Amino acid sequence: MKAFAVLFVLSLIKTELRPSYGLPLLQSGLYNTNQIFQKTQTLPPFIQDSNSTLPAPSTTNLPETNKLASHLQHRLSRSLLSANTTTPKTGGELRGLPTDDPWVVAGFVTLGVVAGGLVLILCYLYTPCCAYLVILCCWFKKWGPY
């Protein structure tokens, strides 16, 4: 039970940090694209890239019905029209921290070390290691970043 409490707290922390890194708040499988994105009759203009041809994001394609739709539109526009288009993006790149302030970076590192230490202590004291690893793997599979 304590392991689930720790995983619940980690889920809350992760939910609070997701908007800072530009990640969606819900899993991608929960989005119904027919409700968020409107279908259009016209084809968007294309951006010619050295590796591929990508459709340019159009601001008229997305409804402004709620904050989630406008947030997704903003993130989509920023990801497709990035300044560095010469480097191919494979989807596995690490995202930078949202700020360059060294105190914020030190705070994130400290938070990670403390959370990791608490998980290790709970793993050692309260549950057998094998069972805890199974619980942790299931948690990452369901609520993990991918």
Swiss-Prot record:
Coiled coil: none annotated. Keywords: Early protein, Glycoprotein. Glycans are attached at N51, N84. InterPro entries: Adeno_E3. Transmembrane segments: none annotated. Pfam families: Adeno_E3. E3 proteins seem to be dispensable for virus growth in tissue culture cells. They are potentially important for virus growth under special conditions; E3 region may help adenoviruses to evade the immune surveillance of the host. This is Early E3 16 kDa glycoprotein. It comes from Human adenovirus B serotype 3.
